[in-house]
Amino acid sequence: MGKVFRSYFYFFVLLQIFAGTSFADDSLLRINSILDSHCIQCHGEGGKVKGKVNLKELQSANLLSSKPELLESLIGVIKDREMPPEEETPLSDSEREELLKWLEVKLSDSIKDQPFLPTQIRRMNRFQYNNSVVDLLELDRPIFRLNERLMRRRDNYFKPETRKMPPQVRISTRPLSKDIDNQRPEGFRGVASFPQDKRAEHGYDNRADHLTLSPLLMESFLNLSQTISESPDLNSKECRSWSWLFASPESANAEDVEEIIRTRLTKLLRRAFRRPVDPVTLDRFVKFTLDQRDAGATFEDSMRSVIAVVLSMPDFLYFYGVSDSKNPADESAKKQIIRDFELASRLALFFWSSIPDDVLLDLAAEGKLSDPKVLSLQIDRMLNDHKSSRFCDNFPAQWLQLDRLITSVPDPKKFSYFYLVDGYRSSMHMMPEPLLLFETIFIEDRSIIELLDPKYTWENAMLKANYEGHAKAGHDVVTQLFKRVPLSDPRRGGVISNAAVMTMTATPTRTQPITRGAWINAVIFNDPPEPPPADIPPLPEDDTEELAKLTIRERLAAHRERKDCAGCHNKIDPMGFAMENYGPTGVWRDKYENGRDVDVSGVLFNQHEFKTFLEFKEIIVKEKERFVRGFISHLLSYALSRELGPTDSPALDEMTDRAMSGEDSMRAVLKSIAMSDPFLQMDNFKRNEKIEDSKSKVPQSP
């Protein structure tokens, strides 16, 4: 971890800055003398580097200015009051503010001419692929059983254009082979499975560095596209594009048929490839279609063959940009404004997890989409479109890491009420609570602060019973009626204090304050802690007679005694122990099983003392700027499909300031991201190598 040593390092560097001295030789001698005594032995001496901090590399002020990551870290430890260390004299508020301003100016100067972090060329993930095929072919239902959707809507209540959620909704949270409302199979018959996607640690499943296209995967996509084109469910009843794509032309004249094919393929390929199709490619596809017909295939079967080819091509599977620069080397040297067609794709991926529609593509073709006024109106239109439900299907569940709840199995002997009829668990009633809260804030365009402290929640009878620590029998455990209810108990509500999060961050028998604290740091503030040392053993699940007498805080005391653990625990433990009133299934408790009182007291952000959970919650809301910045940074990372870096900091600062000044509604925040510099700048990657290499591996039938 090395956080203690880093704090010493930052402290002594900043003393020089605050004193107004430069990194002249005499000051370097004095700093090095201190560092030799406290830090060098672990951070540079003999090639030994702990915590990825090498103090011997620091030789001048210019070198410090050339390290934006270091400057960003300095700003972070000052804001979090991790610097100076506890053993040193603390900075006054005025000193701290002055230092932060100075460092932020240095960081701004350091990165002003630097490009944004590159986004690798990335392929579609499973969710994006399904949505893109559905939108391309205008299908009435998914081609896959969408396990990514942890919650399914059984009412047609998602109507963002109304800005109003109904008082009750019918949903389900269990993957089913049948659609409950109309008894249609979910997913197209005969469609092959999609290759398994990876998810980045502390990231999302749309991250470019985890979405590649190896030869083995390419073979899988070829098979997948073939099965889609051959599915019996791809028919005139399920496919609204049938009339303009698959239906045989009325005219039998060869010239008319060729022109009709060309017109249809122009529309299809522009949609599929998210840009105008070049004449050579279009001619190849037209010739391929005509050759199919000359070989005896029907018009419908010829178009099915075209679909099979299109859905397996890198032009469809990959998302990438095209630079205006004729010299690829120039792309990494400067920031370039994004092209309109790439902007259309980026917007559709962010809000719809899909391809752009014809409106976006038409505006891109006219060069109007990047106009700020036009862009603003299009963002409003996209957020009011029903397809924005996909954003609510995808982002909040990943942000909150709710898939962890699926594998939560509280001890049946201790928590028998958790298990319902036929093996169903209470977790399926816990999951909708935070997801419906997110949807409400999105649809009604409410303040994102309500994610922390709403005055309402969503519950059904079985979830209410779980909070009370008992079971409620019910026959309809799959399709659930959730009602929006006002909160009279301030201990409930929000994305932190709910049964779903409390259950998924516990073991089968006990709570895990460290896990809960790490979750709050990573999810709520986007400040994930470093992994613990490999030699730290987990707490035993089975209590010995001696351990049974201790509280969780007493059991974990040994971890804090290690110098390489103390720094992280100072940040994690207060947040984790603040949640100790919530048992392993989210039921409130004041005492442990051994009769000992639950102690939730702590110091938050190294400055705010609290003794109860409610005091903790008040501090979190009071320090809402930390949450606002963390939430926006999560959204920006999701929108860009990459991790963030120092060059993104100015945009994050600007968006956070705007939200704190009153523009904190969900849609205002989403719009600010889609109109931010990082979102509107060209990806700085070398396009040709990977995309052309992948194209060479695809059978080029046309």
Give the label of every model feature segment.
Residues 25-51, 65-73, 77-702:
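Low-complexity, glycine/serine/threonine/alanine-rich intrinsically disordered linker
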Residues 60-64:
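A short acidic, often aromatic-flanked loop/helix-cap motif at beta-alpha or helix-coil junctions
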Residues 21-23:
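Signal peptide processing junction and immediate N-terminal pro/mature segment
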Residues 1-7:
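N-terminal secretory signal peptides that target proteins for export/translocation
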Residues 8-19:
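Bacterial N-terminal signal peptides
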Residues 56-59, 84:
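Residue-level detector of conserved, well-ordered beta-strand and adjacent loop positions
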